[in-house]
Structures are given as C-alpha cells and as structure tokens.
C-alpha cells in the first residue's frame, strides 16, 4: 500500500515537473519569439563593413530617397527621420520631406514651417495619426521651421504627406482654394458631416461632385494644389468602400501616385530629388505584393533608392484593441544582421549592401531569405504565439539598397492632444 502511494506521489511530481518545464519553455518562446534570440553572422565581418549613420551616402542619380521604419512605435526610428533628412538636405540638395501621413494634415505642417501660427506639437498632431504626436516629430518640424527662417527664396524646406486616410484638412483646404478661385462649394458642403463623409452621399455621389469640382478647377490658373486636394479626397472616398486586404493594395498604389506627384512638383521648382519616409512594408522595393516602393522602383526614371531599418530588440509602443489604450511590448527580430550589430558593439549603424562582397558570409546572408522585424499599429496576444506575425521572411539586400540597424529600440511617448 505504501509503495503504491509513493509511486503516485512520484508520478505527480514528474507530471508537475514536466508541466513546469513546458510552462517555462512557453514563456521563453513567447518572450523571444523562439527558444533564443536567433542566429547571427560573423560580428567581426559585420564590423568591417558597418558605418555610422552620418556616413550615409546615396547615388547622385537617386531622385526618390526613401527611409523605412521597422516599427511605428520606437523613438529611434523617428529620430532617424530628422538625422537622415538633414544629411540629404546638406549633401544631396533635397528640399522636400514627404511622410506616410495625411496629405491635408501635412499641408497644415507645411504652413506652420513657413511661419504659420501654433506650436510644433500642434502641427505634429495635425498629421492625423497618434504615432506622430511625439517630441521627435515636433523636433523635426521645429528644425524645418528654423531652417526656413533664413533660407533663400526657392531653397525653403517643404513638408508633404502622401497618404489619404483622413478627410478634414484636405476638405478644409480644398474649400479655401475654391473660394479663392471662385469655384462654387455648395455641393462640396453636402458631402461631409463633421470630419466624416455624409451618410446621405454614397461613393457615386461623392465621385460625381468631386469630379465636377475638379473640372471647374482645371479651367483656373494656379489651381494645381487645389486639384490635388480633390484627388486625395477621391482616393479617400474610394478606400472607404473596400475591405482591408483590397484597401491595403489600393492604398499603396495611391501612395505611389502621390509620391510621383510630389516629385513632379519639386522638379518644376528646380529640385531634382525628394526624401520620403514610411513603414518598411511600404517603402521596400520588392515583395510579394505591389507595395508603394515596388511600384516606384519599377520606373527607372524615379531613381528610387531605399534605406531599410531593423532592430535586434525593441520595446515598442503599440495600440491595444481599445483605441484609447496603448501598451509597450518587447520583441526580438531574429534578424542575423541586427544581432551581429548587437554583438559587434553598435547601438546604431548603417550597412551599405553595395560595399559588401557577394561571396562573403555577410553578402550571402544579406541576399538570402531571413527574418526581420516588422511591427505596425496593432497588438494582439496572438503575436506571442505566432512570431511570423511580427516578422517578415525576405532577403534584405533585395528589399533595400542599404539598412540601418538599431540594436535596442526604445518606445515613443505619445503626447496628449
């Protein structure tokens, strides 16, 4: 009898021990996205080719210079927007900054940096996405305003948006332009209720009204910017009728068209190139779907050059399912290049793939399919169980011309409106 009880206790201890081991393994897996932080290339070889960010150079032929961000919720990736843009202004004659942000909201920023009222923080909030309500974006906007205070005529910096996911500012500025150009806005007024489309007007009604306004504007001199507001509103209107999957593809197509429009505006003003920045998934020049970058890179006349980014480890500021609440979550990219940057002692560095020999270990790894981090504006506990949901599996040197690696990325702090 005693032996039976002893055996039962032993079995219970064994089962309990196995459950503890399984629970610990699950916690490790959920923390690191695997049973460790991934593989890495030779840190010494990486060290031989990696350079500081201030060494970034792009070909003279580059007309659209793009900077990606692996996440929307890290301070370093927002700081890089300013740091790299300054280099492009100084070394490449760039005068246009184009953001993955609402076109109308970014026009409000553009007016601010040209002497408009308000504060840099208020200007950043006008962009329309909470991810840009940060001190990092306010610092970028302040730099552009300060630069313009002493800029020569025609050499001022300009702030553009190439997204179309907001309505209010584009509609407001379109109405202002119509009033200045003596174009009737009676029917335009009927299209909106507050900051949204009127429920009484369907897609065909909106399209018909906006098309008529555009036709009238085309007969007026100096109406090009106003016409683009119409185009943005038509894009926004069409996107509202599509599912997420179809809408994402169309959004990238629209963003590519808008970037080309921005480039054309700058070239008419005597500037041959522009700087654009958005999520890696939009600026990458290759992928399974037609991203903005892929579409732009197909046309050699664009001279598309893209700098991707990645992290080794991130504390990322992300929204929960409740729009008002955000959370800071830790992720590891499992990118062997980012891990090599960490082991080589870098906090941040730049790697130009054109300088890395193709037959080297580093060159082969950069050209092979590998994991990289990619986090957007959403978080779910499922991401802990499915690491591919926050990683992409692509060849870095095919997606980008060069990359910046941030080894330990810190969260942004979203400012109150």
Annotated model-derived regions:
Residues 2-417:
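Structured catalytic-domain cores with a bias toward divalent-metal coordination
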């Amino acid at each position: 009898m005693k032996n039976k009880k002893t055996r039962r206790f032993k079995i219970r201890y064994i089962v309990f021990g196995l459950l503890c081991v399984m629970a610990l393994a699950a916690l490790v897996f959920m923390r690191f996205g695997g049973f460790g932080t991934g593989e890495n290339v030779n840190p010494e070889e990486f060290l031989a080719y990696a350079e500081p960010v201030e060494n970034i150079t792009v070909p003279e032929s580059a007309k659209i210079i793009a900077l990606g961000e692996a996440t929307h919720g890290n301070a370093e990736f927002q700081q890089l927007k300013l740091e790299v843009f300054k280099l492009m202004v100084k070394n490449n004659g760039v005068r246009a900054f184009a953001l993955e942000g609402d076109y109308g909201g970014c026009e409000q920023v553009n007016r601010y940096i040209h002497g408009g009222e308000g504060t840099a923080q208020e200007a950043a909030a006008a962009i329309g996405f909470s991810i840009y309500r940060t001190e990092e974006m306010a610092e970028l906007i302040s730099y552009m305003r300060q630069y313009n205070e002493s800029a020569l005529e025609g050499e001022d910096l300009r702030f553009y948006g190439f997204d179309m996911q907001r309505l209010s500012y584009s509609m407001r500025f379109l109405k202002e332009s119509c009033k200045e150009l003596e174009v009737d806005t009676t029917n335009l007024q009927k299209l909106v209720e507050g900051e949204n489309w009127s429920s009484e007007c369907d897609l065909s009604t909106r399209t018909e009204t906006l098309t008529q306004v555009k036709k009238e504007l085309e007969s007026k001199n100096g109406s090009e910017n106003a016409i683009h507001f119409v185009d943005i509103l038509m894009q926004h209107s069409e996107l509202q009728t599509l599912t997420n999957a179809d809408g994402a593809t169309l959004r990238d197509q629209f963003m590519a068209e808008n970037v080309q429009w921005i480039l054309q505006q700058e070239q008419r003003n005597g500037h041959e190139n522009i700087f654009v920045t958005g999520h890696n998934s939009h600026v990458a020049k290759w992928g399974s779907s037609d991203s903005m970058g892929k579409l732009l890179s197909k046309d050699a006349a664009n001279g598309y050059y893209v700098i991707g980014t990645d992290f080794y480890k991130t504390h990322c500021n992300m929204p929960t399912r409740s729009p008002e609440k955000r959370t800071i979550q830790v992720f590891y990219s499992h990118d062997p290049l980012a891990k090599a940057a960490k082991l080589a002692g870098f906090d941040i560095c730049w790697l130009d793939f054109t300088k890395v020999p193709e037959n080297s270990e580093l060159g082969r790894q950069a050209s092979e399919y590998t994991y990289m981090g990619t986090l957007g504006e959403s978080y779910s506990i499922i991401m802990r169980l499915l690491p591919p949901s926050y990683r992409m599996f692509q060849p870095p040197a095919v997606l980008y011309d060069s990359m910046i690696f941030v080894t330990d990325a810190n969260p942004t702090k979203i400012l109150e409106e």
